[in-house]
Amino acid sequence: MIDIHSHIVFDVDDGSKTLEQSIKYLKEAKKVGVNKVVCTPHMSRDNKEKALKIVKNFKELKKEADKIGVELYVGTEIMYKENTLKLLKGRKITTLNNSKYLLVEFKRGENRNFENIINALNDFLDNGYIPILAHPEFYINYRNIDNYRKLKENGVLLQIDGTSLINKSSFKTRRFAKKLIKERLVDFVASDTHCTKKRDYKSLKKAYDKVKKIDKNYANIIFCENQLEIVGEIWKDQL
C-alpha cells in the first residue's frame, strides 16, 4: 500500500511529536504492508520558519525510514484560503512530491455554499493543478452524494480516511464514506495518521481488507495504484 496523507513528520503540526514516535508508526506501516508514505504536514500560509523545520525534520526522519524500508516523500495538506493559489504559484507551499497533485481541505463546520468549494477547486484545475479533496466524509454540511459527483465530473479527486471505513469514526461518517465507496467516487484511501491509536496504520490495513472483500480490483486501485501517479512508479500487486 501507498499512503498519500500522513502527519508523521515530527514536531511540525498536530501529528507526531517526536522522532521516536514517528519511527514507531513507520515500523507499524511496514508491518502491515505500507512501503511508501507521502508526508503531508498542515500548511496554509507563507511561513518560512515552519517550512525550513519541516524540511529539516523530514530529512532526519527519512534516514530512519530508509533503515526500516519505507520510502518517504514530501508534501503538505493545505487548508484552503483565498490566497492559496498565489502561494502555490510562488512556491511558498508545496504539492505532493512536487507533482501537479495537491491535497487540500476546507474548514469543517463552516456553513459555506458548496458552489464556493467547487469554484475554489476549479481554480486549481484551471491553473494546471489536480486537487485531491481530503476526507470529504467529514464535511457534515455537505453529505450529499451529488456534490461529489459534480466535483468528480470536473476532475477533482477524492481521498477518504481508512478510519472512516471501520469502527473508529461516527456512524454517519462511516455511512457516507461507504456510500462514496459504493458509488466508486473514491480515488484514494489514506491513513491521515497523526501517530495515535485512533488514526494508525493498522486501521488502514483493516480498511483495505474491508474494501478487498467487496472488490479486490477497486481496493488495489484506491489503496495502491492511483497513488503511483504521485510517487511516479509502476505498481506490482504485492498484497
Annotated model-derived regions:
Residues 1-3, 37, 101, 131, ...:
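Hydrophobic "anchor" residues on beta-strands that sit immediately upstream
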Residues 1-69, 198:
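An N-terminally biased module of ancient metal coordination in phosphate/nucleic-acid-related enzymes
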Residues 7-9, 42-43, 75-81, 107-109, ...:
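Active-site beta-loop-alpha junctions enriched in small/polar residues
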Residues 18-26, 84-89, 114-117, 176-177:
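Short, acidic/polar
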Residues 30, 125, 181-182:
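Non-catalytic positions within long, well-ordered alpha-helices that form the structural scaffold/packing
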Residues 48-159:
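Extended substrate/RNA-proximal surfaces in nucleic-acid metabolism proteins
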Residues 185-201:
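Short acidic/histidine-rich active-site segments
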Residues 209-239:
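Mid-to-C-terminal alpha-helical segments outside catalytic/metal-binding sites
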